[in-house]
């Protein structure tokens, strides 16, 4: 249980994760995001949700 904290931190900060703050968008003042950047997070969430829903219907091997 001692290394659960560092492992979680490593998982959050590893390359390839969605680069947005976990507790809101305080790092991005309104007006600084382009349309493509705004759409990146919802599309990633939809992809993740559809993957988990597919696994719920057809169990992943």
Curated annotation (Swiss-Prot):
Region: Disordered, residue numbers: 1-25
Superkingdom of the source species: Viruses
Keywords: Early protein
Protein name, per record: Early E3 6.4 kDa protein
């Amino acid at each position: 249980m001692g290394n659960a904290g560092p492992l979680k931190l490593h998982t959050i900060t590893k390359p390839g994760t969605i680069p947005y703050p976990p507790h809101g968008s305080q790092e991005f003042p309104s007006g600084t995001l382009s349309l493509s950047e705004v759409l990146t997070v919802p599309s990633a969430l939809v992809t993740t949700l559809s993957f988990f829903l597919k696994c719920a219907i057809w169990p992943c091997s």
